[in-house]
Curated annotation (Swiss-Prot):
It comes from Thermosynechococcus vestitus (strain NIES-2133 / IAM M-273 / BP-1). NDH-1 shuttles electrons from an unknown electron donor, via FMN and iron-sulfur (Fe-S) centers, to quinones in the respiratory and/or the photosynthetic chain. The immediate electron acceptor for the enzyme in this species is believed to be plastoquinone. Couples the redox reaction to proton translocation, and thus conserves the redox energy in a proton gradient. Cyanobacterial NDH-1 also plays a role in inorganic carbon-concentration. It catalyses: a plastoquinone + NADH + (n+1) H(+)(in) = a plastoquinol + NAD(+) + n H(+)(out); a plastoquinone + NADPH + (n+1) H(+)(in) = a plastoquinol + NADP(+) + n H(+)(out). One of its GO terms (molecular function) is quinone binding. Keywords: Membrane, NAD, NADP, Plastoquinone, Quinone, Thylakoid, Translocase, Transmembrane, Transmembrane helix, Transport. One of its GO terms (cellular component) is plasma membrane-derived thylakoid membrane. It is an enzyme of class 7 (translocase). Pfam families: NdhL (PF10716). This is NAD(P)H-quinone oxidoreductase subunit L. It is found in: Cellular thylakoid membrane. Belongs to the complex I NdhL subunit family. Its EC number is 7.1.1.-. The chain crosses the membrane at residues 8-28, 45-65. InterPro entries: NADH-quinone_OxRdatse_su_L.
């Protein structure tokens, strides 16, 4: 059972699209969340590049992610 070339090309395109739109932006979100407040200026420029490059995927994942700060406890 040979796989046709068209099906193979379609599978590769689907895998690359999933990687570009879902997998890498999720990794970028995790990286930004971990390093945002402690990054150097060069690292911050790299972060801006990542956001620009993976913007469509970040836009797709944005409604499902909540990075608001947790409420702090006030002990009195």
């Amino acid at each position: 059972m040979a796989v046709s070339t068209e099906l193979l090309v379609l599978g590769v395109y689907g895998a690359l699209a999933g990687l570009y739109l879902l997998v890498v932006p999720a990794i970028v979100y995790a990286y930004l969340n971990a390093r945002w407040y402690v990054a150097s200026s060069f690292e911050r420029a790299f972060m801006y590049f990542l956001v620009t490059f993976f913007f469509p995927g970040l836009l797709l994942l944005a409604p499902f992610i909540n990075f608001r700060p947790q409420p702090r406890s006030l002990n009195s």
